[in-house]
């Protein structure tokens, strides 16, 4: 049972809150702690403490304004924008008037988009056959493709044989945020109503249980949960069909999975966290069009992951680099951020960065479950597209092309059903089952099926290297046609071992030239939130972080978060520690919601426009 917020009069605590971005965490060494003090209230969000029982909300006008549309799309990423563009293309071609509204939680289109990104352009060219004439930002065709295995000191080159997923011939290195921004312009030119800075916070339902639309979040709420004088209720958007294109681990999709039991016939999703930086490097080290991928060091063979280093041709010697770490890792002492910083010091990586300048940083979770983890995609009144259900081709390290194609197929399926209905009617919750059928008959389904066994093959005794052997034998020869389907090992949060069973990892200190601390890194993400609002990182039980996560796992949230949101600080009275949530640091990666071993953290949307401000990430 939660208790009232303890009085926090400590001067150090006030200093912490005076900073906009906080330090990563206070080191707890290998000791697990428990607290003798009363558990302070951490969570004040109305999703945990309903406002109808709070006297401070008595007399507040809770009426919401409602708008009607034919289609509402949640999320302006590659999938959502592809659906929006294709719907309006079809409407123009068939001389139909369809109202399409798209809401995006970022302040600008593309500001929350982060990917490698090496783009397979097939679906993009299908959507925009005249992309060159329209000036789409595909500036860097791949000219060189390399793959290697890293040991601590050496790089072992591995040939990329024709037909293997890693082959990038014909692809483009892109800054996906810029591409998404360009797609947003095309959508608006076609008549799509695009609303950046509006965060979809709630799914609305008809009396019959079908999806009615969404509501954006309320704004003007104090940190303690009380209404401000500037309080405004969110907006309701009703539609015949609502498309959920939130990206990986969307918070509304989580609700829909439970409401409609969409995961009844699939395996749990498994995830990775991708950390990325942009650097301007010395021109003599610049190889425009080069794509370089590695596996191995600094991760052990039982920790799935790999790195990328892409040389962009953007008018300056720019490289995009990053590390992906599978979130099914077992050691609670592992820090994906610090593994990334350590990786940059490898003898095959460091020379590229020496003399350069880091200009951007960010992180985002990504789906790795593949074919086995795809849920049911349609339900009365709505459907899922893109990285929300998870169409990433993991060995190919690409999901943008499949996300775009899913958006195109969704739009075509919806248009067919909309135009067979009376567009002037307020049809209740159209169930567009044709979309799932069309997807299963497309190249997306065939592609994901062919690589379905590669990611789970890494769970054997040989780990990642066993997966490489499996890929070389079965994928290269049989092209994924083996008569069996391997399974994943369960949910990622279940894989974490107790701290007593693991060895703490000693990471080298950052040198400030190649590797950096978390504080300076988060600053480069541009992340910003209104400070005086309830933390959007909500806890179902405020006592669990200390009494379970810290006690058993030595507080893994302070290490798996790539933005320093979670830290354990000394209590003001008594012995031990308490969890402090620095919500303004959050880059919306969703890792905490995925990896928390107690599944106590629930990520909800903050006020619209908050979060990272990525520029072409």
Swiss-Prot record:
What is the protein's species of origin?
Answer: Homo sapiens
User: Could you tell me which residue ranges the 4Fe-4S ferredoxin-type domain spans?
Assistant: 577-606
Q: What is this protein called?
A: Electron transfer flavoprotein-ubiquinone oxidoreductase, mitochondrial
The cofactors required by this protein are: [4Fe-4S] cluster; FAD
Look up the transit peptide and give its residue range: 1-33
Mind telling me which Pfam families this protein's record contains? ETFQO_UQ-bd (PF21162), Fer4_ETF_QO (PF05187), Thi4 (PF01946)
Give the main localization category.
Answer: mitochondrion
* Intramembrane region list: 109-130, 428-447
Subunit structure, as described in the record: Monomer.
What mutagenesis or variant effect is reported for residue 565 to L? In a colorectal cancer sample; somatic mutation
Which Gene Ontology cellular-component terms appear in the entry? cytosol; mitochondrial inner membrane; mitochondrial membrane; mitochondrion; nucleoplasm
Instruction: Name the associated disease, please.
Output: Glutaric aciduria 2C: An autosomal recessively inherited disorder of fatty acid, amino acid, and choline metabolism. It is characterized by multiple acyl-CoA dehydrogenase deficiencies resulting in large excretion not only of glutaric acid, but also of lactic, ethylmalonic, butyric, isobutyric, 2-methyl-butyric, and isovaleric acids.
């Amino acid at each position: 049972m939660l208790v009232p917020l303890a009085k926090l009069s400590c001067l150090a605590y006030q200093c912490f809150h005076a900073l906009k971005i906080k330090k990563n965490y206070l080191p707890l060494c290998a000791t697990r702690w428990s607290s003798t003090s009363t558990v302070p209230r951490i969570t004040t969000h109305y999703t945990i403490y309903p406002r109808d029982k709070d006297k401070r909300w008595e007399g507040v006008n809770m009426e919401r304004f409602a708008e009607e549309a034919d289609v509402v799309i949640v999320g302006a990423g590659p999938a959502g924008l592809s659906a929006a563009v294709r719907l309006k293309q079809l409407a123009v071609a068939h001389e139909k008037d369809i109202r399409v509204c798209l809401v995006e939680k970022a302040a600008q289109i593309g500001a929350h988009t982060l990917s490698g990104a090496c783009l397979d352009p097939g679906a993009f060219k299908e959507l925009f056959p005249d992309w060159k004439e329209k000036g789409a930002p595909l500036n860097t065709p791949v000219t060189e493709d390399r793959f290697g295995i890293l040991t601590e000191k050496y790089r072992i080159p591995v040939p990329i044989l024709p037909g293997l997923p890693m082959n990038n011939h014909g692809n483009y290195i892109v800054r996906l945020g810029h591409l998404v921004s360009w797609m947003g312009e095309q959508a608006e030119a076609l008549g799509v109503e695009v609303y950046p800075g509006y965060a979809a916070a709630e799914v609305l339902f008809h009396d019959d249980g079908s999806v009615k639309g969404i509501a954006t979040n309320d704004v003007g709420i104090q940190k303690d949960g009380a209404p401000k004088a500037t309080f405004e209720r969110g907006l309701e958007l009703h539609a015949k069909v609502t498309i959920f294109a939130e990206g990986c681990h969307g918070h509304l999709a989580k609700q829909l999975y439970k409401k409609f039991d969409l995961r009844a016939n699939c395996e749990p999703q498994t995830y990775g966290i991708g950390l990325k930086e942009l650097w301007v490097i010395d021109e003599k080290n610049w190889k425009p069009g080069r794509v370089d991928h590695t596996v191995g060091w600094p991760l052990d063979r039982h920790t799935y992951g790999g790195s990328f280093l892409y040389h962009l041709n953007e008018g300056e010697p720019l490289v995009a680099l990053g590390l992906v770490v599978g979130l099914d890792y077992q050691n609670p002492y592992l820090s994906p951020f610090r593994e990334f910083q350590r990786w940059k010091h490898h003898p095959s990586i460091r020379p590229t960065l020496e003399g350069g300048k880091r200009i951007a940083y960010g992180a985002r979770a990504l789906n790795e479950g593949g074919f086995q983890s795809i849920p049911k995609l349609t339900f009365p009144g709505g459907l899922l597209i893109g990285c929300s259900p998870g169409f990433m081709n993991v060995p190919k390290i690409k999901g943008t092309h499949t996300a775009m194609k899913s958006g195109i197929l969704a739009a075509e399926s919806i248009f067919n059903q909309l135009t067979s209905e009376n567009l002037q009617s307020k049809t209740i919750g159209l169930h567009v089952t044709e979309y799932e059928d069309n997807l299963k008959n497309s190249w997306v389904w065939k592609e994901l099926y062919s690589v379905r066994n590669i990611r789970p093959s890494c769970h054997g005794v040989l780990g990642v290297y066993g997966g490489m052997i499996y890929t070389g034998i079965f994928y290269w020869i049989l092209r994924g046609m083996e008569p069996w389907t391997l399974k994943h090992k369960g949910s990622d949060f279940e894989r974490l071992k107790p701290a007593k069973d693991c060895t703490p990892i000693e990471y080298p200190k950052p040198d400030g030239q190649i590797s950096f601390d978390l504080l300076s890194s988060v600053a480069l993400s541009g992340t910003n939130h209104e400070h005086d609002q309830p933390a959007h990182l909500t806890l179902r039980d405020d006592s669990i972080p200390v009494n379970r996560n810290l006690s058993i796992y030595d507080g893994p949230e302070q290490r798996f978060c790539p933005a320093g949101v979670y830290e354990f600080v000394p209590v003001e009275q008594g012995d031990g520690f308490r969890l402090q949530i620095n919500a303004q640091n959050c880059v919306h990666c969703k890792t905490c919601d995925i990896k928390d071993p107690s599944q106590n953290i629930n990520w909800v949307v903050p006020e619209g426009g908050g979060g990272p401000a990525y520029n072409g990430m």
